[in-house]
Amino acid sequence: MDLNFDLYMNDVVEQARNEIEHAGYQQLTSAEDVDQVLQQKGTSLVMVNSVCGCAGGIARPAAAHALHYDKLPQRLVTVFAGQDKEATQQAREYFEGYAPSSPSFALIKDGKITEMIERHQIEGHDVMDVINQLQALFDKYCEER
């Protein structure tokens, strides 16, 4: 049996994109998209998506389920590390003081990083731990919606 790795990876990437988009996150695929959203006043949660196991098993489910909460960011967006390289690099310009990390979450307020949940805070944790971390950020920086 000959498995075409590129086709397989394309399917994995497409599934990962669809999963986070279905949860309500807007895909940012260019540097211009990133600047247009993150320079706005208010709060934006950026999910740095990836194809690693902890993204699919922990980060994306947490990104979806954390939204069942009273306080939420005004905007939910995602960039895809390793896929949308220009958008991901531009988003990381906003993550001042943090090393590149995927999957990860960054809460941006008025164009500036407030806090980040990095890969080491996701990998090896369960979904509920990450949901709690996200909702703690929402409590601290967001308003009821």
Curated annotation (Swiss-Prot):
Lineage of the native species? Bacteria, Bacillati, Bacillota, Bacilli, Bacillales
Could you identify this protein by its name?
Answer: Bacilliredoxin SE_1195
Task: Read off the InterPro entries from this record.
Answer: BrxB/BrxA
Family annotation (Gene3D superfamilies): Glutaredoxin
Pfam families xref list: Disulph_isomer (PF06491)
Per the record, the similarity remark reads: Belongs to the bacilliredoxin family.
Q: Which GO terms describe its biological process?
A: cell redox homeostasis
